Amino acid sequence: MNIKNINANEKIIDKIKTCNNNKDINQCLSEIAKIIHCEYYLFAIIYPHSIIKPDVSIIDNYPEKWRKYYDDAGLLEYDPVVDYSKSHHSPINWNVFEKKTIKKESPNVIKEAQESGLITGFSFPIHTASNGFGMLSFAHSDKDIYTDSLFLHASTNVPLMLPSLVDNYQKINTTRKKSDSILTKREKECLAWASEGKSTWDISKILGCSERTVTFHLTNTQMKLNTTNRCQSISKAILTGAINCPYLKN
């Protein structure tokens, strides 16, 4: 990495830190794309507040026709980039997915993306503290572009900017409060023990309080997490990171 690239990266990082809204974030994404010589970009974070209907946040300049088709056809479920990003942290070149076998009954998302103008591309996985995940993707419509060279160039630059980008995006979008910030320590304790299969009586003995108190705390978690029963509260608390192994330290 030369001095010119370092200065450009520092300039973008400083600009990201001063972003006040998603429009500013979008402008920074556009500048990052220019630095790594890419035509398209997509920044997406999936918040698993619900298994059936997760909250998906996207900032991009992808072709509108492709985005509409992607959403209408429910391609999120079959997207190999999304699947990869769930459990990986290293960037990946999309050409890796071209070599993998696709089930006959499943749509070939990469091939369909290419037919819509996203010929080549690569992605950087994103993971948040509240079990959210996503990716920062870049693509190009030029089939003759040397993707491996672009990918290498991006891999030395984007990781320097991505942490600031994710942090400031989440800071701006504060309407998505972390569930663990609204639960009290006692409520977390009751949920954590309930997730271990303990009954109300068991939890009362473990925590040294009455069964009525345990029921009170668990009922409060339902209201705060917008759930209808104990099982759903446990599920949502785990999905959103409201309860985890070190809960007693919170």
Curated annotation (Swiss-Prot):
It comes from the Bacteria. GO terms for biological process: bioluminescence; positive regulation of DNA-templated transcription; quorum sensing. Transmembrane segments: none annotated. The keyword Transcription regulation applies. It comes from Aliivibrio fischeri (strain ATCC 700601 / ES114). Residues 200-219 bind DNA. One of its GO terms (molecular function) is DNA-binding transcription activator activity. The keyword Transcription regulation applies. Belongs to the autoinducer-regulated transcriptional regulatory protein family. Keywords: Activator, DNA-binding, Luminescence, Quorum sensing, Transcription, Transcription regulation. Transcriptional activator of the bioluminescence operon. Binds to the OHHL autoinducer. Coiled coil: none annotated. InterPro entries: Sig_transdc_resp-reg_C-effctor (IPR016032), TF_LuxR_autoind-bd_dom (IPR005143), TF_LuxR_autoind-bd_dom_sf (IPR036693), Tscrpt_reg_LuxR_C (IPR000792), WH-like_DNA-bd_sf (IPR036388). Residues 176-241 form the HTH luxR-type domain. SMART domains: HTH_LUXR. This is Transcriptional activator protein LuxR. Gene3D superfamilies: Transcription factor LuxR-like, autoinducer-binding domain, Winged helix-like DNA-binding domain superfamily/Winged helix DNA-binding domain. The gene is luxR. GO terms for cellular component: protein-DNA complex.
